[in-house]
Regions:
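Short conserved beta-strand and strand-loop elements enriched in small hydrophobics
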Residues: 366-375, 402-419, 465-466, 497-508, ...
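Membrane-embedded multi-pass helical conduit in multi-pass membrane proteins
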Residues: 195-280, 296-355
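N-terminal helix initiation/capping motif
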Residues: 334-386, 397-398, 456-518, 528, ...
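Acidic donor-binding loop at a coil-to-helix junction in glycosyltransferase catalytic cores
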Residues: 119-125
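Short, solvent-exposed secondary-structure boundary/capping segments
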Residues: 390-395, 428-442, 520-525, 556-569
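Catalytic donor-sugar/metal-binding loop of nucleotide-sugar-dependent glycosyltransferases
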Residues: 128-144
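Long helical/loop segments within the catalytic core of UDP-sugar-dependent glycosyltransferases
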Residues: 12-119, 131, 152-191
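Short beta-strand-to-loop acidic/aromatic patch adjacent to the donor-nucleotide binding site
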Residues: 1-9
Length: 592
């Protein structure tokens, strides 16, 4: 039985990467080849009940998006899916996360189907399968991807459901105490339970220096050197263990930031659920994209963090007031503690501020062969990224594709082929080439299906590991700059190609060609040679006649005039429009 969330899209290799696990007990590998075991060789005790592949998402999660970190950190859920869950294989205590999974029907029948008295039926299903004596296994190879939640409200609601549901399931199955699970599995589930109480620990960690520095309330009675001896080694080894165990998917700083963000909203639900005050209603996570940025969510959800930040600032000011020399030195532990917490609180406030979303569909990096056609013109290029409503491709040379005209695109991969049509919406010079962006749609339903497969039948292009060179200072500076920067929409739909050469027209008039974009020439130092005409003809090296007309439009402080290409449609129909660039470039080289 394969299960997927409604928004999850499996890759074409999903079944081939998961189903063979269920056959391992019946096959043996000898001399590099697999053979079917004899009946007496089969281990009857080996019963694989579930294979869990990682949860993966093709859109940035809120930590990546709201903090402008989609190029620096992986999805927040990657740490559990690709690191924690796979490590739980050793204790046979992996968590079924509800999607991207294959379950043995026999195992489902033995436990009586999905449990109903919990709001995390997926987690409890894997727990009951393990209690029934089956092996469960988590892999680290991504085989499906979907949408992660895009609003703070829905993310918090999702985490509350996970917290309450997991505690419900642990209570329903007595997982921590049952003798039907091995000791390692029970310890793993004890750790699972304690994790949800870590948010209460986080609150104590944030409030302790505030209570001491601002209200003179002492949480722990210790001397400066006692703290150094006990705290500093613990801090160091915790940081090292996070770095060693997480494979650069998560570090201590980001763990504390994430816990600080969720802290105010998980303490009460965890407390209620622990004392059997249950939530029974399953609330579906909203994944509809919203692009409002700062608004209601900030005003509501940032309040606890703003209060804690204000208290921390007040505590720091009061604590350092009047201290000098050794007194200030011995106060450094408390100051470091407060500042350390304030950094996480600043992250939380930036997170709650949100960020405007300008795209309706996610853009996924994909390098595939693409053929572009317009009338008699045909070009070969490579896609840069694709989305449901648009695509971008990269060309080594600037090519002519008319503005506001329908262009045909054919994308070909090793498995799919899609014919699309659309219009160029943006062109810019990039990476020693030219990037073209287009708004597109499929020509029919079959091509739409093929195009959807091209987009989603791939591993997403978001980071899989952290950029360890990015510090908290870098994050803060980036957030401030991005939030102060006014959005600018470049509307250029044709390539502007610099020329800088002198040309002479057939009537003796001359000018300096500054640049052109196939539709217009920008010229300076125009000498009409006494002609009163506003139309001029220039013959290129190949003898192509360019009929240019003065528009009366001046740019760049009136130092340059625009000349329109009158016979553009004729040049396009004869498929010689691109030869113009070649001729002018060749002339440049000869003159050089």
């Amino acid at each position: 039985i394969a299960t997927f969330d409604a928004d999850m899209i499996p890759q074409h290799t999903f079944l081939m990467k998961t189903v063979p696990y269920f056959l391992l007990s019946r096959f043996a590998k000898e001399n590099g080849k697999w053979r079917l075991k004899k009946e007496e060789e089969v281990d009857k005790k080996f019963r694989l009940g579930l294979i869990q592949t990682p949860q993966s998402f093709y859109n940035p999660d809120l930590f990546q998006f709201n903090l402008y970190a989609e190029g620096n950190i992986p999805n927040e859920q990657d740490f559990f899916s690709r690191e924690v869950n796979t490590m739980r294989n050793t204790s046979n205590a992996i968590a079924y996360t509800g999607s991207n999974t294959v379950i043995l029907r026999e195992a489902m029948e033995e436990i009586g189907g999905f449990p109903l008295k919990t709001i995390t039926e997926d987690f409890e299903t894997s727990l009951r399968i393990q209690k029934a004596g089956f092996i469960t296994y988590a892999t680290d190879e991504i085989q499906a991807a979907g949408l992660t939640t895009t609003t703070i409200k829905s993310m918090i609601r999702q985490r509350v459901r996970w917290a309450r549901g997991i505690i419900q399931s642990l209570q329903n199955t007595h997982a921590i105490a049952t003798p039907r699970l091995p000791l390692l599995a029970r310890l793993t589930y004890l750790n699972t339970f304690l994790y949800w109480w870590s948010f209460f620990n986080r609150l104590i960690f944030v409030m302790s220096p505030i209570l001491f520095a601002l209200f003179d309330y002492r949480i722990v009675n210790s001397h400066f050197w006692d703290v150094i001896v006990f705290w500093l080694p613990a801090y160091f080894f915790y940081s090292m263990s996070m770095r060693y165990l997480s494979s650069n998917v998560r570090n201590q700083r980001w763990s504390q930031i994430i816990d600080t963000i969720f802290m105010p909203y998980l303490i009460v639900p965890v407390l209620l659920e622990t004392f059997h005050i249950h939530q029974r209603k399953f609330k579906v996570t909203n994944k509809k994209k919203e692009g409002k940025g700062i608004g209601f969510e900030f005003a509501v959800f940032a309040i606890p963090h703003v209060i804690l930040l204000a208290l921390s600032a007040a505590a720091m000011i009061r604590f350092v007031h009047g201290k000098y020399g050794w007194a200030l030195f011995y106060s450094s532990i408390i100051l470091f503690w407060i500042i350390h917490n304030m950094v996480s609180l600043f992250y939380a406030i930036f997170f709650m501020l949100g960020r405007p979303a300008y795209r309706n569909s996610e853009r996924i990096r994909a390098e595939e062969d693409i053929t572009i056609q317009y009338k008699a013109l045909t070009y070969e290029a490579r896609t840069a990224d694709v989305s449901e409503n648009g695509l971008a491709f990269w060309s080594e040379k600037p090519i002519y594709l008319p503005e506001n005209k329908t262009v045909e695109f054919v994308i070909t991969t090793s498995h799919y082929k899609a014919r699309l049509e659309g219009k160029i919406v943006y062109v810019k010079e990039q990476d020693k080439g030219w990037r073209y962006s287009a708004a597109i749609r499929a020509v029919d339903e079959e091509n739409k299906r093929q195009y959807m497969q091209i987009i989603y039948d791939r591993t997403h292009s978001l980071p899989m590991q952290m950029d360890l060179w990015v510090t908290a200072y870098d994050d803060m500076l980036r957030n401030i700059k991005k939030r102060l920067k006014q959005p600018f929409k470049d509307k250029r739909k044709m390539p502007r190609i610099p020329m800088e050469r002198q040309i002479t027209f057939t009537n003796g008039a001359a000018c300096r060609l500054v640049d052109f974009n196939y539709c217009y020439f920008s010229v300076s130092d125009f000498n009409t040679n006494g002609s009163q005409d506003d139309t001029f003809i220039y013959n290129t090296e190949s003898g192509i006649p360019l009929v240019l007309k003065r528009t009366g439009i001046y740019i760049r402080h009136s130092s340059e005039e625009l000349l329109s290409v009158v016979n553009l449609d004729d040049l396009t129909g004869k498929n010689i429009i691109n030869q113009i660039l070649v001729d002018i470039k060749n002339t440049d080289e000869k003159e050089g």
